[in-house]
Design a protein with these regions (language model features):
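Extracytoplasmic cell-surface/polysaccharide-interacting catalytic and binding patches
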Residues: 1-75, 79-200
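Conserved small/polar residues in nucleotide/adenosyl-binding loops
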Residues: 211-213
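Conserved metal-phosphate-binding beta-hairpin within the catalytic cores
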Residues: 206
Length: 213
């Protein structure tokens, strides 16, 4: 059991609302583009109201301190979308290993399941241990230029390997690594300044919580 599953959950009643136009969104949405089962395009970009309030402050502060903008890569995920993406990640990992398997036999390959769960929360419908993105309190963010173009951070969002660790480039001293590490540090420092916690395995994933969810 992951440590956050031991923490009692209490819904604070914060509304799930559309993300305002003052925040930059990745277009097209990466999972909708893959066929993830969102109800419609209006249901893609949503977060809890307090999360949005703090993101606006993050973006304003980021712009005042750098040449970057905050770019939201992904936000709230309906459970059906979480299931779609989890299955896709698992089956792609099986394909890389030349394993022909149906998702129903997922437990037959615990090493692959363990790797996937390091980056993708299992699509549990248990209200006491929901996937973080399905609560509306977690999101994936990047840095962009003023036109919304992604800034290189040293790995792609959702890249399931060690380069996605927030501190992977901290002790690598070539020119590119130093730049990527400084950008990751900037993103983390500003997000945490406004109350967000960073996922220990993903430089892009943050949640408004006292723990990493």
């Amino acid at each position: 059991m992951k440590i956050w599953n031991k923490i009692p959950i209490k819904d604070n009643g914060d509304k799930l609302i559309a993300i305002p136009s003052c925040l930059k969104l990745l277009d097209p949405h990466p999972y909708f583009h893959l066929g993830a089962p969102y109800e419609d395009k209006t249901s893609i970009w949503k977060l809890r109201e307090e999360v949005i309030n703090r993101l606006v402050k993050v973006n304003d502060y980021l712009i005042s301190k750098s040449s970057f903008n905050l770019l939201i890569y992904d936000s709230w995920r309906p459970l059906e979308v979480q299931e779609f993406m989890f299955k896709r990640a698992f089956l792609l990992e099986c394909e890389k290993s030349d394993i022909d398997i149906s998702f129903e036999n997922i437990k037959s390959y615990p090493s692959i399941l363990k790797k996937v769960e390091k980056f993708w929360a299992y699509p549990s419908n248990d209200n006491w241990c929901p996937p973080p993105h399905s609560t509306g309190g977690a999101l994936d963010v990047c840095l962009s230029d003023k036109d919304g173009n992604l800034i290189e951070m040293g790995s792609m969002v959702d890249q399931m390997d060690e380069t996605s660790n927030p501190y992977f480039y901290a002790n690598i001293k070539n020119e590119e690594a130093i730049i990527w590490n400084s950008r990751r540090n900037l993103l983390r420092e500003i997000m945490t300044k406004f109350g967000f916690a960073q996922h220990p395995n993903e430089w892009w994933h943050f949640s408004l919580s006292l723990i990493h969810i």
